[in-house]
Amino acid sequence: MKEVGEVEEVRCLDPQLWHACAGGMVQMPAPRSRVYYFAQGHAEHADGGGGAAAAAAELGPRALPPLVLCRVEGVQFLADRDSDEVYAKIRLAPVAPGEAEFREPDELCPLGAAGDAAEPSPEKPTSFAKTLTQSDANNGGGFSVPRYCAETIFPKLDYRADPPVQTVLAKDVHGVVWKFRHIYRGTPRRHLLTTGWSTFVNQKKLVAGDSIVFLRTRHGELCVGIRRAKRMACGGMECMSGWNAPGYGGGGFSAFLKEEESKLMKGHGGGGYMKGKGKVRMADVVEAASLASSGQPFEVAYYPRASTPDFVVKAASVQAAMRIQWCSGMRFKMAFETEDSSRISWFMGTISSVQVADPNRWPNSPWRLLQVTWDEPDLLQNVKCVSPWLVELVSSIPPIHLGPFSSPRKKLRVPPHPDFPFEGHLLNPIFHGNPLGPSNSPLCCYPDTAPAGIQGARHAQFGLPLTDHQLNKLHLGLLHSGSFNRLDAITPPSRISKGFVVSSAPAHDNISCLLSISTPQVAEKSDDRKTTPHIMLFGKAIFTEQQITSSGSTETLSPGVTGNSSPNGNAHKTGNASDGSGSSICIGFSSQGHEASDLGLEAGHCKVFMESEDVGRTIDLSVFGSYEELYGRLADMFGIEKEEIINHLHFRDAAGVVKHPGEVPFSDFMKAARRLTIIAGDRERIERPLIECLVEQA
């Protein structure tokens, strides 16, 4: 029951509770720290992505810098009075040109008093978030408390009583105290919130899919917060969205938004319901951008759950990211969190090109500068453009994988091409009017709109893109320092199978010489006979998928091309191509999405997915000795009773037959399992989730 009636209209939250409700990846700048303000990102924040065009239209011909260096004057942690959604008001003051040389330490906002600098908390407060099930959100029902939350966050329960029961008091984001009855009962026994929970659900208008957050502050006070699930205009649930930007032609839609849901969103005005949308008006963006460009102080409202990237970014992060000379082929990793912010997962990707996301409306802006491709495209198929400071560079060039036929004592080097000396010819164009500096600016990077690099056979990859070889001969004069020029006049390269990129150069251009890293002994002798064009790699003949297919029975591939169908319908073909010297090279051709089918996991590992999530949690099956240990781990991980898992655990074998785990030895199950998905049962068994293990052969 509610014990506090009226609350003051503007009330600052406890920063610890605010951060727990905002999510683990949210980091607020500290007062007096230096940040960059991106009006382009602010416009996305106001309209879920389509606001950039509207902001540019309202600003008209006025010159607007792509980013403005500011000092944080203050931060207020607040919550919406109606929805309990947390947000912050950040007061910013543009840094005058004369102050740009003065450096101050940039720190993240400590969990102290709102708006003031404070000593960092000695330890992170304990919190727990759970996505509400249909049973939890039922009117008149109770809340099933995961054991971890009950034992570490709630007050200690006296298990000697029969039944163990206590009253729990929790304060929400508005300072209102709620009273719940906590009892440990049932068969099997579990922790429940009964009396008072139904009132809380009705008052907060909670539905299945929303998340509840419990936090124990460093002072021992129990707090409760809410993370509402995103909803479509039609009332349905929306997947985790983080990158909606329909105003940018190719620049990032929802991070985990499937094609069908994307179409549904477009059918309802291109946005649906999104947290933060409607709270930040476009007029506020225009006003803030105008004040920032004129050097006057201004204030912005920031909604951490609005599913758009931060538009107030720590200055040191931006400067460090833009000192990197970004170019296609670089490998990186990027963090994403689940909808309920319970897990943060890192995903690997490759930069495909470097270009301004919207050169017409926001020229010279580093916002969403990197176009990327992902190792797991089925999960991140719509995240196409990201900002450099959001990724962590793993390798500046694609890795070199030496096959077993290569001698470990030999040094791998790219032979010089007569028409393209490699040293001293790489250009570093920069942005015009770059506020971060002149020609030695950290905003230097390589322009590239071509696909990333030569991806050879899986046994041998090296990171010098073929288009770089051809730059000197074809279009070296098209690039010059000081701009990002799109190479529209260049014939786009043709992609051969997955990972092979061969430029559409004239026939007399010796492509095989550019791809050949070999010794004279293994080089093939040319003759007057008509030969099939091929690629030479380490002195071995690499045949394309089209050549293998067209060769049929006339050209021998030992032992031939075999097709293995993966569970997701993608074929994986392998073939052995003879090089004429008695040895052969095994080449793997995989269609788009094959790498995602095995999830890039090591042997004995698999990923576990909740039905409502698109980001999995990796577990190591090799540490378990039996199904019982696995059941216990899943029960602790998802807050599901162990008995329910035992009764409803099924898996599908390679033939597609659904079986009970008891029919297969655990050792076989451990070797084959790659993906486990926890799905809800039908309406009659809504409280007894069905766990389906989708098994794929490695």
UniProtKB/Swiss-Prot annotation:
Compositionally biased region (Polar residues) = 549-577
The cross-references to CDD domains, in alphabetical order and at most eight, read: B3_DNA (cd10017)
| DNA-binding region listed in the record | 128-230
Per its record, what are the GO molecular function terms?
DNA binding
Residue numbers spanned by region Disordered: 549-579
Q: Say yes or no: keyword Nucleus present.
A: yes
Q: Give every PB1 domain span.
A: 603-683
Identify the tissues in which this protein is expressed: Expressed in roots, culms, leaves and young panicles.
Q: Which UniProt keywords apply?
A: Auxin signaling pathway, DNA-binding, Nucleus, Transcription, Transcription regulation
Q: Which Gene3D superfamilies match?
A: 2.30.30.1040, DNA-binding pseudobarrel domain (2.40.330.10), Phosphatidylinositol 3-kinase Catalytic Subunit, Chain A, domain 1 (3.10.20.90)
Q: Name one Pfam family in it.
A: B3
Protein purpose: Auxin response factors (ARFs) are transcriptional factors that bind specifically to the DNA sequence 5'-TGTCTC-3' found in the auxin-responsive promoter elements (AuxREs).
Name listed for the protein in its UniProt record: Auxin response factor 22
